[in-house]
Amino acid sequence: MLEANVYDNFNPNYYNISDFSMPNGKKEKRGLPIPKARCQVINYELWETGYLYTSSATLTVSVEVGDIVQILFPEVVPIEEALGKKKKLNLDMVYLVTDVDESNKATLKNYFWAMIESLDVPNAITKTTNFAIIDYLIDPNKNNLMSYGYFFNSSIFAGKATINRKAETSSAHDVAKRIFSKVQFQPTTTIQHAPSETDPRNLLFINFASRNWNRKRITTRVDIKQSVTMDTETIVERSAYNFAVVFVKNKATDDYTDPPKMYIAKNNGDVIDYSTYHGDGTDLPDVRTAKTLFYDRDDHGNPPELSTIKVEISPSTIVTRLIFNQNELLPLYVNDLVDIWYEGKLYSGYIADRVKTEFNDRLIFVESGDKPNVI
């Protein structure tokens, strides 16, 4: 049976204030409070990352919507927080209580996703680096919940991901989901004692580090003994259309008097000017689904870029997902890169989540989308 700590809400309005006196006289953010209750956890389904599913558990003390629940596991998780600097974290899963029924069964939202809920990201930020986007997301000045920093593997999140959008902002949930899918990594949350021995505070960190700084692919196989289930996941949801008829406003007439240009999404996901296509049609969709688009020219008189049109007619990215019981002889951790043999076929991807119940310990493997760096 698991145990849990229950806290009042980690409200940044209170904790994001730098008036805590350190032994050296420096002022820091207020640390987390002591738990208001310790309880047991039964009838639970607990997701470690919660990128897709909501958790639930029945607690042996009363909880309220807005409370924070830290589930404690008799297990340690290895991470390498910097190159050559390995440590082991006690496995804990931190949630926000979003609902409680009459039997005191709580609906639990993973802390990271609850923290950034309702936050929007300006497109100026999404056009920068992955690190800059994450730094924008993990900011208690803007977020719903308090955090004190993060363990971060810069090698995993190196580079830039271009997120094509028509609107001026994108939801933080959407941006985060797309970045994590692209780099094959999901964040977790942990409550730890402050790194300095002279710092008495307990703090909450977001973990963006895996068990090895340089992740190496692990090859394994799963079979019927691990109760495998297979389905699909749409990691990037785009358009139901595959053909665009594009009108661009004529500046002289201030109307759509110029002949339209046509664009088509090929079977491999590329979007091309249809007038330049000289193939035999076998690499094009079996059924054309057209959409008519109207655009103004920009301030310099330029028509829309191809990337703008691509958003309108690119197909969704759908990948295979395998859910199976943990193999105690070869334990896998969330964010491991894995090549899995199943029923004679090799799937390449990563462990995106882990779910613990009273009866089993199961992993979610998500296949790599293997798409260009436009998400």
Curated annotation (Swiss-Prot):
Keywords: Viral baseplate protein, Viral genome ejection through host cell envelope, Viral long flexible tail ejection system, Viral penetration into host cytoplasm, Viral tail protein, Virion, Virus entry into host cell. InterPro entries: Caud_bapl16_1st, Caud_bapl16_2nd, Caud_bapl16_3rd, Caud_bapl16_4th, Gp16_dom1_2, Gp16_domD4. It is found in: Virion. It comes from the Viruses. One of its GO terms (biological process) is symbiont genome ejection through host cell envelope, long flexible tail mechanism. The keyword rRNA-binding does not apply. The keyword Ribonucleoprotein does not apply. Forms a dome thereby closing the central channel at the end of the baseplate. Changes its conformation upon activation by calcium allowing the channel to open at the bottom of the baseplate for DNA ejection. This is Baseplate protein gp16. It comes from Lactococcus phage p2 (Lactococcus lactis bacteriophage p2).
